[in-house]
Amino acid sequence: MLKIGFFADGPWAHKSLEKIIENDDFQIMYIVVRYDSVDKVLVEYAKRLGVPLFKHRNVNSGDFIQMIKKFDIDINVSMSFNQILKKEIREIAPLGFINCHAGALPFYRGRNILNWVLINGEKEFGVTVHYVDDGIDTGDIILQQMVEISPDDRYGDLLEKAYIACADTLYKALCQLKQGTAKRIPQNTIHSTGFYCSRRVMGDEYIDWSWDSERIYNFVRGIAIPGPGARTFFKGEEYIIDKVELINDMPCYIDKVGNIVGKSTSGIVVKTGSNAILVTRVLNADTKEACAMNGFYIGNRFFADKHICPPPEHL
């Protein structure tokens, strides 16, 4: 029997927990949720399993550590938990503290990885189970799985793929740990540096129309709803550019970026830094409802910044 402490939040955790509890060789001893949120699904799981559910402002505090030591667990697992885990809590369990990260470590450490892999135009993304150490996503790798990204995948599609892949990879890693066959691969043996991705914040969602068309295409799908959506301004109002298509054989030429330079039955053609891109769906930024495309005319212009967007009568 492998006795597990589960530090977790959200759909990532729900899928993983569902798979773990199907195996009679695994026993969840307690569940620790984020202090700043309420995960009703994990609350119900704790009741169903008959295990305590903890919420603590600082899981590294002495009182919390003493409390969970009593459970005599074999391993602690982190799945979308948001507190830094210091040395003392990492060493409570004999098999250590492991984390499941939706990134192909040592690349794509950090935050908002599924957004970044799409923005970067990747053809696949990784899911990695690794030991937690003093760094951020730098611990030795136990197991890694690569997942294909299709050309039409958007942020929501990757989330669904990642929920399943994380659950599968974590489950396999726990099986290996129980059997004593788990690997321990230092990340610097894969690449000497790897790289980190920053947390995306408000203000990062605006399209720079001077980017080339492929970059705009990847940006739009990379932060599509349920993300914030790729934003732009038109006649002083904010809109979400929800879907775009690359235009085959579109020549490169110089013109004012953001200008609407054509229309078709599919949408509007907007000038980019390289050539032009077809915008097929625009949403109202407040209601998220689709806008009628006949309200956008050739010669009108999209802007990345409201403060440089001329008054409507000048557009």
Predicted features and spans:
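A short, sequence-level motif marking secondary-structure junctions
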Residues: 242-249, 281-287
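One-carbon transfer enzymes
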Residues: 1-231, 237, 262-278, 284-288, ...
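A conserved acidic, glycine/proline-rich C-terminal tail/linker
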Residues: 247-267
